[in-house]
């Protein structure tokens, strides 16, 4: 697109295509899913980088556990995208892109676990599908469990969640 204002012209090229907040691993979602970038931001604001277990007691479609695993393993967030708009540019260098895109030299081992709980069997099914699509089944353990049955872990861990709110939830749903 271009914009002309008085004697200035701004030319913008779409290099990403689909919005970058759509990471590419989400196969399905629950009602009102958490934005992937917001989930990553919530995790990063805690300073957590994988040095202990992480628990999401109301994980819905698994966005927080998946983003946490990506952060813990230092996996680039765009790695699941099928395509970028810049791949259609005339001067696109496929060999260079493949070399950068497939470089996993900065990835880390993750020796802890990420736990995602939800009381909704359908949400658990969706989260399981998304975790598998992201290739993170080794790092993330999902379980159908009501919030009231949550027990404080014995080991140091961090809890991050996005509880349902508003009309989507009633006391009976917890």
Where are these regions (language model features)?
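Class I SAM-dependent methyltransferase Rossmann-like catalytic core
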Residues: 24-34
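Non-catalytic substrate-recognition/targeting regions of SAM-dependent transferases
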Residues: 1-25
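Hydrophobic alpha-helix-in-membranes signature
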Residues: 56, 162-163
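A short acidic, Gly/Pro-enriched loop at the edge of an enzyme's catalytic core
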Residues: 148-160
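Proline/glycine-anchored alpha-helix kink/cap motifs
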Residues: 68, 163-166
